[in-house]
From Swiss-Prot:
GTP binds at residues 38-46, 205-211, 236-239. Residues 136-139 are annotated as: G3 motif. The modification Phosphoserine is found at residues 763, 767, 847. It comes from Mus musculus. Residues 38-45 are annotated as: G1 motif. This is Dynamin-3. Keywords: Acetylation, Cytoplasm, Cytoskeleton, Endocytosis, GTP-binding, Hydrolase, Microtubule, Motor protein, Nucleotide-binding, Phosphoprotein. InterPro entries: Dynamin, Dynamin_GTPase, Dynamin_GTPase_CS, Dynamin_N, Dynamin_stalk, G_DYNAMIN_dom, GED, GED_dom. Residues 235-238 are annotated as: G5 motif. The lineage of its organism: Eukaryota, Metazoa, Chordata, Craniata, Vertebrata. Residues 64-66 are annotated as: G2 motif. The keyword Nucleus does not apply.
Length: 863
């Protein structure tokens, strides 16, 4: 791929970096970059300055770079620099750039030589650079100097690893040529995070400072300690050159001259030097960006989809539009009306699967809670019979009656009908509360405008309470109507004749066949206590029995309990218990289950308890209304009189009891039918009509429109941030989409072939030229190395390591014949047992025979 295409591609990433850095998202997005890693005084700063063509990085002894420097190089006709923290300010004097880097470093890290992982973003525009993005990291050091913290080595290592462990970060490992390459900290760190060598580019500096008679040809030809992407050699300015004001241009010319004139490098001069390093880095970065963009695009699209639904309500919002408030108010009231109706009437669109809607809860009130409250109020048999007995006796007075008085029937019936007011009014209260809860949920969409939300909720809630009063009046009127006239000619009323015939019979509940009424999970709490813990079972309620199974597959039945003579009662919630409990018991004092008189069943909520009670009621299991233990004297007298009733009075009581039961069943059916209809008409439908027709007018009349449509500061900020993020994501995806599809990437180089190491051990003595370069070499690998075969063990084949690939021919010694290459023992078999040659310390004048590039066959870098 040509330089033109590279120049088009890499600025896209710079634009992405700027777009998200401004939003504080740079730390979340791993964009392709090149991290420069090396020891202190390895020449990292000089390499970067050669790219820019200017002196702009701080220099000094010890640790100078204490924060990562994100350096973006941009080709431009003008030459200047910009910092992200000083956006808009152009630095044309690069001495000021150096001072700003030092000042910004001190602002975060202080003056105690500490470090920080917060990057400094610097963009340099120049006609002398190619488009590159690099990160200059602090130099690797091991011993703290001066007032550096004791753990400075680990701090620097952690910070470097924070950058180079990213899969989309290329590593520029800088190593001086006059040090031991096998012990390069930069290469070791790169090898640790990039064992395949796909992300590592080696840079050899200070080639001009090597001792006389030595060179780095084998390293630069990628023969010694090879890297998959190879090495590039550079020659930087010395401190003497810098002090002598030698400019970058002159240094580049001197570098070019050095490679062309050096006998060991002239044949590879076109692949050496800072200009070639720039091109290599550009090519590698471009390839890496192209490989990363598909995953990056998917990540951006995922973020875009996650906020798109919220942004949909924001993106058409235009504060500068004078009519926006009227339009927004109208749309929000309409949406509120639609949401309210959907929650009440139900809708197949966007069904909530987590909780019941307002309409579903009102349905449960109508058909489960209200009937249950009626039955719970109605069935108190002993008290009812006592009241009938008193009514008969009081009507007869001093006389002895021969016939059953119908006035006693009317008195008892009217009293029972009046008792229906309690459950009826309670159902109105429950429905009102559900309507208000529904309104609160619907106004959440208006949360962008707190005043509008508050006013809407207030107006609708006030109307609901107003309708509640009128609905209660109508409910009381309906019950009073029933009390006003007792219609004994009703077609379903049994009449006196039938009541007398049934007076001697025991009243039995009517069954509805053996159909399944309800299924669900319940916890048997009292049995579980005896056996070490409560257990959950799958219960099936029919019209005749209550069965429970091990699970909802209903294969293993645990027990079947007949419903005859069963009643249900409430059980107080236990201490520290989150369960709601009710109990079943037998009215004839028999055991319900094995040795247990009560069967206590637990639910997760009171709603579930009420629902199960209503289902049991449908099956004929009525609630028990226990009579208090503290009885008054009148109760005791009345109870005594009940025991002393004569047979005639007993027959009259039973007759009226049957008449009351028959007539109240008619009234109950009527009330259970009319009360929900009354609530629906006077309350629910009226509230819906009010919201559709009058809410908007009342909002306009209640407050000024501008006041209603004022956004909260938090919402305005959130909306702006959401829209800005949305636009940034759209722009980022558009930038990625702009990449020329015709561009192609250079494929990654194959794994390096280290089979030449095997051959070199078996080769005849090298030529004098080669001998000069290999005067002193490092020892061969120890025979006990755990990461490679021992030297004494012959290799199974010439290609036992990485797959063999063609490599650049160099002045390698001639290979022995093939019969020798497998059978001959390694050259110098006693070499592994010898201590490595000592490296004398640098002191003037340097020893002409001192090795500069030590070439150990380090298994940690070769495997």
């Amino acid at each position: 791929m040509g330089n033109r295409e590279m120049e088009e591609l890499i600025p896209l990433v710079n634009r992405l970096q700027d777009a998200f850095s401004a939003l504080g998202q740079s730390c979340l997005l791993e964009l392709p970059q090149i991290a420069v890693v090396g020891g202190q005084s390895a020449g990292k700063s000089s390499v970067l300055e050669n790219f820019v063509g200017r002196d702009f990085l701080p220099r000094g002894s010890g640790i100078v770079t204490r924060r990562p420097l994100v350096l973006q190089l941009v080709t431009s006709k003008a030459e200047y620099a910009e910092f992200l923290h000083c956006k808009g300010k152009k630095f044309t004097d690069f001495d000021e750039v150096r001072h700003e880097i030092e000042a910004e470093t001190d602002r975060v890290t202080g003056m105690n030589k500490g470090i920080s992982s917060i990057p400094i973003n610097l963009r340099v525009y120049s006609p002398h650079v190619l488009n590159l993005t690099l990160i200059d990291l602090p130099g690797i050091t091991k011993v703290p100097v001066g007032d550096q913290p004791p753990d400075i080595e680990y701090q620097i290592r952690d910070m470097i690893m924070q950058f180079i462990t990213r899969e989309n970060c290329l590593i520029l490992a800088v190593t001086p040529a006059n040090t031991d390459l096998a012990n390069s900290d930069a290469l070791k760190l790169a090898k640790e995070v990039d064992p395949q060598g796909l992300r590592t580019i080696g840079v050899i500096t200070k080639l001009d400072l090597m001792d006389e008679g030595t060179d780095a040809r084998d390293v630069l030809e990628n023969k010694l300690l090879p890297l998959r992407r190879g090495y590039v050699g550079v020659v930087n300015r010395s401190q003497k050159d810098i002090d002598g004001k030698k400019d970058i241009k002159a240094a580049m010319l001197a570098e070019r001259k050095f490679f062309l004139s050096h006998p060991a490098y002239r044949h590879i001069a076109d692949r050496m030097g800072t200009p070639h390093l720039q091109k290599v880095l550009n090519q590698q970065l471009t390839n890496h960006i192209r490989d990363t963009l598909p995953n990056f695009r998917n990540k951006l699209q995922g973020q875009l989809l996650s906020i798109e639904h919220e942004v949909e309500a924001f993106k058409n919002f235009k504060p500068e539009d004078p009519t926006r408030k009227t339009k927004a108010l109208l749309q929000m009231v309409q949406q509120f009306a639609v949401d309210f109706e959907k929650r009440i009437e139900g809708s197949g669109d966007q069904v909530d699967t987590l909780e019941l809607s307002g309409g579903a809860k009102i349905n449960r009130i109508f058909h489960e809670r209200f009937p249950f409250e009626i039955v719970k109020m109605e069935f108190n048999e002993k008290e009812l019979r006592r009241e009938i007995s008193y009514a008969i006796k009081n009507i007869h007075g001093i006389r002895t009656g021969l016939f059953t008085p119908d006035m006693a029937f009317e008195a008892i019936v009217k009293k029972q009908i009046v008792k229906l007011k309690g459950p009826s009014l309670k159902s109105v209260d429950l429905v009102m509360q559900e309507l208000i809860n529904t309104v609160k949920k619907c106004t959440k969409r208006l949360a962008n405008f707190p005043r509008l939300c508050e006013e809407t909720e207030r107006i609708v809630a006030n109307h609901i309470r107003e309708r509640e009063g009128k609905t209660k009046d109508q409910v009381l009127l309906l019950i009073d109507i029933q009390v006003s006239y007792i219609n004994t000619n009703h077609e379903d009323f049994i009449g006196f004749a039938n009541a007398q015939q049934r007076s001697s019979q025991v009243h039995k509940k009517s069954t509805i066949g053996n159909q399944v009424i309800r299924k669900g999970w319940l916890t048997v709490s009292n049995i579980g206590i005896m056996k070490g813990g409560s257990k959950g079972y799958w219960f099936v309620l029919t019209a005749e029995s209550l069965s429970w199974y091990k699970d909802d597959e209903e294969k293993e039945k645990k027990y079947m309990l007949p419903l005859d003579n069963l009643k249900v009662r409430d059980v107080e919630k236990g201490f520290m218990s989150s369960k709601h409990v009710f109990a079943l018991f037998n009215t004839e004092q028999r055991n319900v289950y094995k040795d247990y008189r009560f069967l206590e069943l637990a639910c997760d909520s009171q709603e579930d308890v009420d629902s199960w009670k209503a289902s049991l009621l449908r099956a004929g299991v009525y609630p028990d209304k226990s009579v208090g233990s503290n009885k008054t004297e009148n109760d005791e007298n009345g109870q005594a009189e009940n025991f002393s009733m004569d047979p005639q009075l007993e027959r009259q009581v039973e007759t009226i009891r049957n008449l009351v039961d028959s007539y109240m069943s008619i009234i109950n059916k009527c009330i259970r039918d009319l009360i929900p209809k009354t609530i629906m008409h006077l309350m629910i439908n009226n509230v819906k009509d009010f919201i559709n027709s009058e809410l908007l007018a009342q909002l306009y009349s209640s407050e000024d429109q501008n006041t209603l449509m004022e956004e909260s500061a938090e919402q305005a900020q959130r909306r702006d941030e959401m829209l800005r993020m949305y636009q940034a994501l759209k722009e980022a995806l558009a930038i990625i989409g702009d990449i020329n599809t015709a561009t192609v990437s250079t494929p990654a180089p194959p794994p390096v072939d280290d089979s030449w190491l095997q051959h070199s051990r078996r080769s005849p003595p090298p030529s004098p030229t080669t001998q000069r370069r290999l005067t002193i070499s490092a020892p061969l690998p120890r025979p006990t190395s755990g990461r490679g075969p021992a030297p004494a063990i012959p290799s199974p084949g010439p290609h036992s390591g990485a797959p063999p690939v063609p490599f650049r021919p160099g002045p390698l010694p001639p290979f022995p014949n093939s019969s020798d290459s497998f059978g001959a023992p390694p050259q110098v078999p006693s070499r592994p047992t010898r201590a490595p040659p000592s490296v004398p310390s640098r002191r003037p004048p340097p020893s002409p025979t001192r090795p500069t590039i030590i070439r150990p066959l380090e298994s940690s870098l070769l495997d």
